[in-house]
């Protein structure tokens, strides 16, 4: 059996801790034979555990403590600590592992709820489970969210080789915002969401680059954001914004400029991968 969970990008600029979009990069988990103890073979390195302290197995055992150990093989295209939802993908993979082996018959809504409890908010986990674009909120311990089709466009991910921990990126954010600035920030997010619902990526893109919640504070940790926005604008893109907490920058563009834009971004003197992606529409899947 195989479990596949997509990468996700959160925020899309002003949709801070609320908007998320599934992307065509994947964490794939192959479930092998039963074993005396849990072992997860993977291609990540970097101190990621191979035993039951691995997030995937830990999550599964929290849901189903009596699971029989198996040999697992994980292949992950989602680089860690880059703002592409690697931790959310691991959590969702663990939920799917427990659901599959213990035959829990969890609904998608239950999977989102469990994952959001673990991660703290639904912005990455909801699109990882459901696919496509999700707008959500966690209020008094309850999750509220709406899934909708994202407008057709090209997505170009500029993924620096250097990591940026979410904890570090959150550390530069202020504890509070002045009321007038918060109202303005909220109105920007509202217009962005309305524009996406209307398939107006030109207006949505303008709002994406006017975020007041987090990007101006995080830009000091991601100095390449300004360069990428300039290249994106010069090549006809709709917008470029931080993916999650960064350092990845996601560029939204018409499909007919995607190849040229990708080539232009590859010429920047920054050690990075530049990938042409799509919106992932299915979310987490199990192949039997």
Curated annotation (Swiss-Prot):
GO terms for biological process, alphabetical: threonine biosynthetic process
PANTHER family registered for this protein in UniProt: HOMOSERINE KINASE, HOMOSERINE/4-DIPHOSPHOCYTIDYL-2-C-METHYL-D-ERYTHRITOL KINASE
Catalytic activities: L-homoserine + ATP = O-phospho-L-homoserine + ADP + H(+)
GO cellular component annotations of the record: cytoplasm
Matching SUPFAM superfamilies: GHMP Kinase, C-terminal domain, Ribosomal protein S5 domain 2-like
Function of the protein: Catalyzes the ATP-dependent phosphorylation of L-homoserine to L-homoserine phosphate.
Protein name: Homoserine kinase
Record pathway: Amino-acid biosynthesis; L-threonine biosynthesis; L-threonine from L-aspartate: step 4/5
Organism: Listeria innocua serovar 6a (strain ATCC BAA-680 / CLIP 11262)
Enzyme class, UniProt record, top EC level: transferase
PROSITE patterns tied to this protein: GHMP_KINASES_ATP
